[in-house]
Amino acid sequence: MNYSVMIQNRRSVHAFREKEVPSEAIGQLRSYYEKTCPRLVPEIATELIVLDKDAQPALESSAGYNQFLIGAPHYLLLMSAPHSYAAINAGYMMEDLVLKLTELDIDTCWMTFTDSDKIKKALSLTTPLEVAAIVAFGYGEKTAKKLRLNILSMSQIDVRASSSTTRPKRACMIWFTWGVGATSLGLTR
């Protein structure tokens, strides 16, 4: 996976079409998680659960922005064993899975939640692992092109036609923290 290209192409979608993601793509995602997905702390036990749209009613009362759940054909739940670095590890892993979905031309949206036990109860999950991250995924609705005023500085202003409401990405180097994450991916300065 070319991380630089995937980071530039990644966007968050808040309206999904009803179109299901093919089982082959979900299989590729599962295989990527099991064999390739980097972990910051490999000794933390994790599990990836892929849910379909039938899980939406259960998630509506326990996840989403102020209990407002983004409707999607599928949801990813990343479960993690309790650990002082569980949240960091899960965020790192899930963002890598989001980039893999981007590579497969599948749109995503991170979901907020505050109570792992409430989600586990709503979904009837009996695992000892805790919910660490949730992402909705599928194919985003087509959006009309909109004019966007792009102000880079006081002297660099342009107007662009944009087909999405995403914001330009800052250079990858600004956001990427050199250290454990870089070395686990085999990157050097």
Task: Give the label of every model feature segment.
Residues M1-R189:
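Acidic, surface-exposed loops and disordered segments
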